[in-house]
Amino acid sequence: MRIVSLGGLEEIGRNMTVFEYGGKLLIVDCGVLFPEEHHPGVDLILPDFSYLRDRLNDIVGVVLTHGHEDHIGGVPYLLKERSDIPLISAKLTLAFIKTKLQEHRITAKTVQVKEGDRKKFGPFDLEFLAVNHSIPDGMAVAIRTGAGLVLATGDFKMDQFPLDGRITDLAGFARLGEEG
């Protein structure tokens, strides 16, 4: 398995990671970076899609871990490259995305998941786990392939008493750790 970050490392924002296996690509998050004062006239900064342009037809889906702009803000721009890429996420995150896509006049294929769900997209077997964050409905995704297991957590916090009662699934994280 090859893992390529297209944004989000050593910066706060533009989160986007590509997982490659068996000739197929799975993307986790597709966010924007908000410019600072040394970027006058710039509204937002996108991940660099050039790595994907020759392989758009190999993308099996985009998993969105939660609804913050630094994780979902680039989705309309990716879908302008290929509009039928499935967007995979929790109910609230998909609601945010649908509203954002309406502004761009894009209709997306969406797949709603919840914690505990397992879904297969190409060679990727995905398992979704609850995470707590400053926005409801956050999820981590365990990505299984013939090469092994990777856990992509997105952003999360360790709050044992969140307002919505939904805590990070530490038992699930431990189980995945035992699995390897």
Name these PLM-found stretches.
Residues 1-63, 68-180:
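His/Asp/Glu-rich metal-coordinating catalytic cores
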